[in-house]
Structure formats: C-alpha cells, structure tokens
Amino acid sequence: MTNIRKSHPLVKIINSSFIDLPAPSNISSWWNFGSLLGICLALQILTGLFLAMHYTSDTATAFNSVTHICRDVNYGWVLRYLHANGASMFFICLYLHVGRGLYYGSYMYTETWNIGVILLFAVMATAFMGYVLPWGQMSFWGATVITNLLSAIPYIGTNLVEWIWGGFSVDKATLTRFFAFHFLLPFIIAAMVMVHLLFLHETGSNNPTGIPANADMIPFHPYYTIKDILGLLLMITALLTLVLFFPDLLGDPDNYTPANPLNTPPHIKPEWYFLFAYAILRSIPNKLGGVLALVLSILILIIVPLLHTSKQRSMTFRPLSQCLFWLLXADLFTLTWIGGXPVEHPYIIIGQLASILYFSIIXILMPLTSLVXXHLXXX
C-alpha cells in the first residue's frame, strides 16, 4: 500500500512542496526568508481577522474603536501591536528576500521573480491602506498626500483621485473602502504566493554558487524544516521583543492624535519601510516626475533579468558586482534616513544624489561592471 502522503490528491501536493521537495544541499540562511514571509502573512491575516472583529470603519468611531481594542478587549493590545510590528517584520523579511534574489541571481527564474515583484506591490498597497485605518493624524494626512499623487496623471488625474476618495476629500467613503480592500488584499496575496511557489517548484531553488545543483539535492524535510524553525524562532524573538518592550518604537506619535482635516502635522511621513521610496518621490521637484520615480523605484526590479550581462549567475565570485551591491544597500539606508528628515538644505541634495545613485547602480553600473568583468575573464 502506498503512503497516504504520496497518494492522497491534496496531501501529495503538500508533500511535494514541503516534505519530499528536493532542495540544494548548500543553501544558506538567506533562503530562510521565504518561509518567514509565509509565516508573517499568516500572522498578519490572523491578528488582522481578530482586530477586524472589534474595529469600526467609520470616521466618527475608527480612532475610538482602536483605543477600545487596546484598553477593553482581552489581549487586544497584543493583537494590535503584533499586527503593527508584524508589518515591520514582514517588510524586513521582504527586503532581505529581494536582496538575496538580487545578490544570487535568483531573478533568472523570471516568472517567479515577476510574480514576486507584483507581490511586493500588493503588500505595499495593503500596508499603506492599513496605516490609514486607525484614523490618527498621520493616517489621514498620509492618505491625503499619497492618494493626491494620482492627480499628477495627465487628463484623468483629478477624476481618478475623486473616484478613489469617493468624494472631494479623504472622508468616510475613503476609510470604508480602504478597510474593505485592506481586508481583501491579503487573501489575494496568499493566492499569489501559491502561484509564486508553483513557478519556483517548476525549476527548484537556486543556491549560493549560482551553479545548478541537480546532482546534489537533499529532501526539504527534515533538513530545511528544522533550519526554517530556527529562523522562525529568531524572528519571533525579535517580534516579541518589539511588541512587549518597544511597541511604539517604529510608529509615529502623531498617530495618537485623532485625524483633524484642519490641522496639518509639521512633518508628514510614512512608516519606516516606505521612507526610501518617499525620499525618491520628494527628491524630484516636479509632481509627475516624482510619481514616476516612485513607481519606477520598485518597477525597475522587473527589468533586472534583462540587465544581466554576466557569464555567471550569482555574485559569489564577482567582487566588483559585490561592491556595487553593498553600495546599493548603503544607498537604500541613506534614502530611508533622508525620507524621515525634513525638506531642508543638506537633506535635499543628499536625497537627490542618493536617488540618482539608486537608479544608476541598478540600471547602468551593475550591467557595465558585469560586462567589464566578462571581458577581463575572456582575456
């Protein structure tokens, strides 16, 4: 009799995805972030579901309902801060996961990569809408500023913004629809994750050398299940430290003031995980130009596979490309810092230079370096 694990139509899908899956024997901890992202998503959906049971998406009561969750609901404060800081862990894992893909050439699996980029956009949209829901000052003004960017689109811009708002300003209609979409999108994301994995399992995982490892594969379970659990424990430790000791470390104090359309906060800025994109947006003095740069800062990932000029897949044996990669990372930290600083003399020019550098590294310097290295190798 065959094992139910291999014969049952449903169980055999799980088996071929998480148990008997052949995996390269040399993948490092940088390959842990996929499973961590899956767990982050599950955590966000669960905590979000329980928060939604007590939340009201009406401008008159939204802020108070969040206060009520924190004060009166059993362990409501844990749910709320797990959900808020879980988003931060989600984005840390997301950015490290993308960085891993860039470094080791995983983007050569184009279908998997492109679905990953779409997933990134979807998660960013979800996080943005979620930030609006508590209806604090930053929620309201963040929603106003970011939705207003669409008015830069020629001809249809203004109509588009008013259509999204459901009126002539960010109001009840906007909050209600943002809640609806914030609830819906994670399930769409979960479905897309399945497709992401489907395409990944067509090719199998990449590995740190960038050389096909078909000759040396090991079963996913127990080797990588136990390795993933270690990564999970580390992430949960970090998350719980954040939630139980520093729950408001990454938040904005302005969001503890109820939304007031008549009073603009001194510095409007998004959550930390959007600051790099916000800095790129602000570094261009033209509205439409800024919006385009903002979208392209993420969309540029789509064309990365086309810009691969090296003979080798991974950067493991390419010191020049490695230098550029870490310069890119430092540049992203710089942009994140600038995004949170006010629009004043030293910061403006730093932000502009960092933005130029960001696009130059990805689109010009990296392909050129790979070409040069290929010629050096040939010689």
From Swiss-Prot:
The chain crosses the membrane at residues 33-53, 77-98, 113-133, 178-198, 226-246, 288-308, 320-340, 347-367. GO terms for cellular component: mitochondrial inner membrane; respiratory chain complex III. Disulfide bonds: none annotated. A ubiquinone binds at residue 201. Heme b b566 binds at residues 97, 196. GO terms for biological process: mitochondrial electron transport, ubiquinol to cytochrome c. Heme b b562 binds at residues 83, 182. Keywords: Electron transport, Heme, Iron, Membrane, Metal-binding, Mitochondrion, Mitochondrion inner membrane, Respiratory chain, Transmembrane, Transmembrane helix, Transport, Ubiquinone. GO terms for molecular function: metal ion binding; ubiquinol-cytochrome-c reductase activity. Its main location: mitochondrion. The cytochrome bc1 complex contains 11 subunits: 3 respiratory subunits (MT-CYB, CYC1 and UQCRFS1), 2 core proteins (UQCRC1 and UQCRC2) and 6 low-molecular weight proteins (UQCRH/QCR6, UQCRB/QCR7, UQCRQ/QCR8, UQCR10/QCR9, UQCR11/QCR10 and a cleavage product of UQCRFS1). This cytochrome bc1 complex then forms a dimer. Component of the ubiquinol-cytochrome c reductase complex (complex III or cytochrome b-c1 complex) that is part of the mitochondrial respiratory chain. The b-c1 complex mediates electron transfer from ubiquinol to cytochrome c. Contributes to the generation of a proton gradient across the mitochondrial membrane that is then used for ATP synthesis. Belongs to the cytochrome b family. This is Cytochrome b. It comes from Myotis oxyotus (Montane myotis). The lineage of its organism: Eukaryota, Metazoa, Chordata, Craniata, Vertebrata. The gene is MT-CYB.
